[in-house]
Amino acid sequence: LHQHGVIHRDITPANIILARDGAHLIDFGIARIWSASSNRSRDTTALGTYGFASPEQYGFAKTDARSDVFSLGRLLGFMLTGVYPDASDYEQRLADDAAVPARLRAVIGYACAFEPSKRPQSVQEFRQALFSQSNPPMPNASSANPPSTRTTNGSASASRLFRRLHLSKRAIVLWSIAGAALIIAA
């Protein structure tokens, strides 16, 4: 998508469908064409789904691939917690070591840094941080989702996690496959 100059600007669970050949991103209604040589200094309309849209989408700043990286970070947080990012208990669930291992929380914090320059600069860089064995760079205090300072002694068992999220195993697997497919396909 980005290699073709398209910025989606509305990556949410509702805009992902699963098909036999994998996960697909749909609803390009607010997508825009972007290029490095574009003379557009800012977007003029606040668009995107609240909770998933990047801060620059609401601050009338220029959006680019890093805006979609922010949304992917929020999508990952949703997949791990089962709670939408605009819910009152999202941050609490995200900070729960039993639900979200510290390393994944750090990846989410990195992707969701308030300043675009502090985020992965591309979906490929986000994918590398997600699948790397080392910890991603830690965002500074201006991140949208500061990672918890608590440590973890390992991730919870799958059955305990499913019970905590009140989601079926099928739903967890489908969301995980969809998210991973989108990240890998990018």
Give the role of each language-model region.
Residues 1-6:
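Protein kinase catalytic-loop region centered on the HRD/HxD motif
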Residues 15-26:
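Conserved protein kinase catalytic/activation segment
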Residues 41-56:
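Conserved activation segment of eukaryotic-like protein kinases, specifically the C-terminal portion
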Residues 68:
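Conserved catalytic-loop aspartate of Hanks-type protein kinases
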Residues 99-114:
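Conserved C-terminal C-lobe helix
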Residues 119:
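Conserved HRD-motif arginine in the catalytic loop of eukaryotic-like protein kinases
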